[in-house]
């Protein structure tokens, strides 16, 4: 059975030769960097907070030291990526420090806008990192993950949240790109 992820589909849509070299010929290069480490650490930090908020209480979630949790997740992700690359560090200590400082600011903003961004009233947390596996044609499956999945208790609609940690926002072309949205 063939499997296609969102990133594979995106690469194929933009450059079929790059897709062939990377996924068929297996000539791809590891892209481990601070952005991957930071994105994974920030996702895990926010997802843990939301899990506690929706499944225990908002009060309990607000007692979590998010800065410490983010630091621990950054170290964990750094070590995980370092194992993959051997002795080479996936990023510098300076990059880790800079991104950690940015992450603390993001988390401060996140908690200050919590009531506007995430309401507990009328919503339930269905899943974090919900795996998707849909057959898009016989023998080919699209695979992916939903970062956060909420359900509106009143109308039964689902809210899909895709956490983003890009250093740049999307321009109007990216927002209108049907591959991305």
Predicted regions and their residues:
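Generic detector of ordered secondary-structure context
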Residues: 4, 34-37, 95, 140
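Mg2+/Mn2+-dependent nuclease catalytic core
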Residues: 123-181
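Nuclease catalytic cores
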Residues: 9-10, 14-54, 100, 104, ...
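An acidic intrinsically disordered interaction segment
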Residues: 1-14, 140-151
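A non-catalytic, helix-rich entry segment at domain boundaries
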Residues: 45-128, 135
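Short, charged/polar micro-motifs that form catalytic or ligand-binding hotspots
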Residues: 28-36, 93, 171-178
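Short amphipathic alpha-helical segments and their helix-coil junctions
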Residues: 1, 16-29, 81-90, 160, ...
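Hydrophobic/aromatic-lined pockets within catalytic cores
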Residues: 25, 50-54, 115, 150, ...
């Amino acid at each position: 059975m063939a499997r296609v992820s969102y990133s594979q589909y995106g690469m194929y849509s933009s450059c079929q030769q790059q897709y062939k070299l990377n996924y068929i010929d297996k000539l791809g290069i590891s892209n481990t960097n601070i952005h991957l480490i930071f994105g994974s650490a920030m996702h895990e930090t926010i997802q843990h907070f939301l899990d506690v908020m929706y499944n225990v209480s908002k009060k309990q979630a607000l007692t979590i030291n998010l800065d410490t949790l983010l630091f621990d997740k950054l170290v964990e992700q750094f070590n995980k990526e370092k194992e993959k690359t051997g002795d080479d560090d996936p990023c510098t200590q300076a990059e880790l420090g800079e991104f950690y400082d940015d992450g603390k600011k993001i988390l401060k903003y996140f908690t200050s806008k919590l009531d506007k961004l995430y309401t507990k009233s009328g919503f339930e947390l269905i899943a974090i990192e919900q795996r998707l596996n849909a057959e898009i044609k016989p023998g080919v499956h699209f695979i992916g993950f939903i970062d956060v999945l909420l359900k509106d208790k009143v109308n039964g609609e689902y809210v899909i949240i895709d956490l983003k940690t890009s250093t740049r926002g999307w321009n109007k072309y990216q927002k209108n790109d049907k591959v991305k949205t």
